[in-house]
Structures are given as structure tokens and as C-alpha cells.
């Protein structure tokens, strides 16, 4: 994707998610070229975030993209879609998202993700279960709302490939059904990670089997080629 296009890329997560994100990077063939920044889950979290932000500035990062990242609600806590606080296992990466000069892009599907503060809270409250409680208040400069967050990420890559045809082969290098399956299988096997919607450690995302996601990729590819 972006790294193959020659742009500086860093991936940030918190300690509870670090193993899973590292596995996804390996599955994508992005490790070790794409560095992984891990924000502490306890202790001086603010200092940990500040250190990562300083590293991003030094690396020349210009855009921060939050994908399916649970963010702060109005009461300051992050919530899952069931309205349960996940503050104990979720570092406030909102502060990294907003803590530098980068353009901020949020991608989400449930209203509780970083960037959803771009939308009126009343809209989220009226649109999803527990919306009034879980709506994230952290805004983005640009927001992509989608049925599944992965699809929004696919769409962003496809749109950039359309805008930069000279970089399209690089941007689309991991945007194939086979590559997506490899990432998912590595994530499930080595993360280990599962699908909370399916309630199982399975190669599915938000309850949809891989074949559904591969079809979305194929449709985006067809749209780009038409």
C-alpha cells in the first residue's frame, strides 16, 4: 500500500493489541519495513504517546489514519458496540491522532471509533444501538463511514490509486483477495485474534466470511479498471 508507494508509514497500537497488529503486518509482508509503535497500556501513557508523536514528526508523517479504533465517548471512556467500557484495555490513542500537525482521517462503522466526532452526536444516537452512550467525540478532518471498517480502508486505497495512477500498482499491491486472506489467516493464527461478532476465533470480520470481503475488493478493482 502506502509503504510500497514510497511514503513513510508507521503503525501505532496499544499494548493489548500489539501481538495481533504485529501478526497482521507480517501477514501483509510489511514487517519489518513498516515500523510498529506500541503505546503503553498503563503507567505514564501520556509520555508514551508523546514519544510516538515525536517519532512520527521525525519520520515525516503527514496523515494519521484511524481504522476501527475505539475512541473516547462524551464521558471520556471508550465503549464497545454493546455499550461496555473498554477503558481498561484501550489506550487513549485519540491523543496521538490529534497530537500532531498531520491531517486526520477516521474510518469506522459503528459510531464509537476515533474520528466519529466529525458527525453530530444526535445522528449516531439515532442510528446505532447504544449510540448516545458510545458515540466517539474525537473528530477527524475527513471521515469514512462504511458497513465494515475494512471496506472503508479498501476504498481509501482504491480512491488514491485512481488519483495517482502512476502509483496504482504499488498502492494496490496488497489489495487483493489472496493478500487479504493471508493477512486474516496470519492474524487469527498468530495474533491470536477472533471475530467478536461471530463469537469465535475464525477467519471472518464482523460476522462476514472472507469471501464477502474478497468480493468487495473485486468490485472496487472493477470500478477502478472501468
Region roles according to the model:
Residues 91-123:
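Catalytic cores of nucleophile-dependent amide-cleaving enzymes
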Residues 17-22, 114-115:
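Short, charged/polar "capping" segments at the starts of alpha-helices
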Residues 6-16:
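Short internal beta-strands
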Residues 10, 37, 63, 103-107:
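Hydrophobic/aromatic beta-strand patches that form the interior of the parallel beta-sheet core
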Residues 14-15, 39-42, 67-70, 107-110, ...:
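Fold-independent oxyanion-binding glycine-rich loops
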Residues 21-97:
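An acidic, phosphate/nucleotide-engaging active-site surface
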Residues 3:
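Gly/Ala-rich phosphate-binding loop of Rossmann-like dinucleotide-binding domains
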Amino acid at each position: 500500500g502506502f509503504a510500497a508507494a514510497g511514503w513513510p508509514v508507521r503503525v501505532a497500537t496499544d499494548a493489548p493489541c500489539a501481538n495481533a497488529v504485529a501478526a497482521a503486518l507480517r501477514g501483509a509482508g510489511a514487517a519489518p519495513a513498516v515500523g510498529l509503535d506500541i503505546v503503553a497500556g498503563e503507567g505514564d501513557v501520556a509520555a508514551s504517546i508523546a514519544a510516538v508523536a515525536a517519532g512520527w514528526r521525525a519520520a515525516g508523517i503527514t496523515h494519521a489514519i484511524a481504522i476501527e479504533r475505539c475512541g473516547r465517548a462524551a464521558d471520556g471512556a471508550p465503549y464497545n458496540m454493546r455499550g461496555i467500557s473498554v477503558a481498561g484495555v484501550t489506550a487513549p490513542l485519540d491523543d496521538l491522532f490529534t497530537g500532531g500537525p498531520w491531517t486526520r482521517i477516521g474510518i469506522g462503522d459503528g459510531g464509537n471509533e476515533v474520528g466519529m466526532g466529525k458527525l453530530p452526536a444526535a445522528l449516531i444516537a439515532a442510528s446505532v444501538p447504544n449510540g448516545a452512550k458510545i458515540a466517539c467525540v474525537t473528530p477527524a478532518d475527513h471521515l469514512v463511514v462504511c458497513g465494515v471498517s475494512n471496506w472503508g480502508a479498501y476504498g481509501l486505497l482504491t480512491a488514491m490509486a485512481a488519483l495517482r495512477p502512476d502509483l496504482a500498482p504499488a498502492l494496490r499491491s496488497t489489495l487483493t483477495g489472496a493478500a487479504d486472506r493471508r493477512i486474516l489467516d496470519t492474524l487469527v493464527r498468530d495474533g491470536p485474534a477472533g471475530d467478536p461478532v461471530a463469537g469465535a476465533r475464525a477467519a471472518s470480520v464482523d460476522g462476514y466470511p472472507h469471501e464477502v470481503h474478497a468480493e468487495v475488493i473485486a468490485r472496487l478493482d472493477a470500478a477502478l479498471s472501468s
